Each structure stands twice: as C-alpha cells, then as structure tokens.
C-alpha cells in the first residue's frame, strides 16, 4: 500500500480537498490518502503558522510519526503545500518516493509578478489587512481560484471557515513564509508538475520554468483554474 500525503495551500485546510480525496483513493486502489493541516489552518487554526516552510515540513513529519505512519510517502501539494513538499523532498529524500506539485511557484526560478499575478494584489491585500465579511472573503477566493463555476462549494467553504477560522496574522505569516522560501536548484525525487492554463492567481509560466530547471514532466490542464482538484478533480 502506498501512502499519499495531501498538502493544501495558503489559508486552506484538509476539508478544502472536498470529494477529491475519495476520488483519488478510488482511482488508485491500494493507496491511502492522509490530508494534513498546516499549523494555523483547519484543526490547527489556533496555532501560529511557521514563518519558514522547512518548519512546516518538520510539523508534518512529527504528525505522521505521532500517527505511526512511516515513510516512504508520496506527496501531493498545491500552492504553498507544494512548497512544503519540495522542502520535504530536499531535506529528507529518503522519506519521499515521489511528488506531484500543483500550480506552485518557487524562488528563484520565477519573478514575483508571475508567482502572484498583479491583478490580484489589491484584492488580496484588502482581504489580508482589512478583512471582509466571511461570504465576501470566500466568494472572492473562489472567483480567483476556480474557473469552473463551482459556486456549489461556497456553503461548504463557509462552514469550514466558521469551524476553523484562519486569523489575518496567520494568513500574513503563511504569505511571508511562501515569499521567503527558496527551492533547490536540483531535484532528485521523481516529480510530476500539474498546472492550469487558466490559473488567474499564479502564472503557468512558473511551472514551465520549474520543469525546465528540474527536467521533470509537466502536464497543463487547458481550462482549469488555480484550484485544479476543484475544477476537474
């Protein structure tokens, strides 16, 4: 049996995978999916988010050890979660069998304006610094991360937000950790990159640059948005 560790992105939690985890397990018989929350998100919303991506890795490793789930692991990470996967693979390659990275962006391979599209600066700053009505917040995030008209998930997202509220301080801490992280120039772990051609948050050029740097496989979905598992899981 293979163990797949799912890692979500900025301010998102394991619940945001929705039905994708069950679909994944059905598609790959014999695999076990473990969706982890990063500190500050989900069931860990009362913890302070680490300011360094490697510290997020160590939290995940400790949690899996606590659950008696030994390596090797297959990692599937999206956005910030993909950065955690990369840092994990670089620091502990003996623990990682392979990794799938979805719509991620990494220093030093991509400029800031590709890692976060400028059209979103104003909205994200307003949400992070000034806050917003919960429905306005989640609807705004859905609008910039999905291209599939997935309004049906909004009530679920609002319920997750009410149950596990992410503080503005933790949102900023996660954003800072993501901005500061520098990826290795060489990757020895088998890696598959998945990118969305209609990603409105992160340019597909980031995954293309990473594929060139690491000489790894890249698959581009032509119509999905940033939240690829939501749009076409």
Spans of model-derived segments:
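Conserved HGGG/HGGXW glycine-rich cap/lid loop of the alpha/beta-hydrolase fold
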Residues: 1-46
């Amino acid at each position: 049996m293979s163990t797949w560790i799912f890692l979500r992105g900025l301010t998102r939690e394991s619940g945001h995978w929705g039905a994708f985890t069950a679909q994944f397990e059905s598609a790959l018989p014999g695999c076990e999916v473990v969706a982890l929350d990063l500190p500050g998100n989900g069931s860990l919303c009362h913890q302070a988010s680490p300011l360094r991506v490697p510290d997020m890795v160590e939290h995940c490793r400790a949690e899996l050890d606590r659950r008696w789930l030994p390596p090797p692991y297959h990692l599937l990470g999206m956005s910030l979660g993909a950065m955690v996967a990369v840092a994990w693979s670089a620091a502990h390659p003996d623990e990682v069998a392979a990794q799938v990275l979805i719509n991620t962006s990494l220093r030093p391979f991509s400029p800031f304006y590709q890692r976060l599209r400028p059209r979103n600066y104003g909205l994200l700053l307003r949400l992070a610094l000034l806050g917003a009505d919960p429905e306005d917040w989640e609807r705004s995030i859905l609008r910039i991360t999905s291209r599939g008209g997935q309004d049906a998930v909004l009530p679920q997202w609002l319920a997750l937000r009410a149950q596990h509220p992410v503080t503005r301080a933790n949102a900023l801490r996660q954003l800072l950790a993501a901005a500061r992280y520098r990826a290795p120039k060489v990757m020895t772990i088998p890696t598959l990159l998945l990118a969305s051609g209609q990603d409105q948050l992160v340019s597909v050029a980031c995954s293309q640059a990473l594929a060139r740097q690491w000489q790894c496989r890249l698959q581009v979905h032509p119509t999905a948005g940033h939240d690829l598992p939501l749009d076409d899981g």
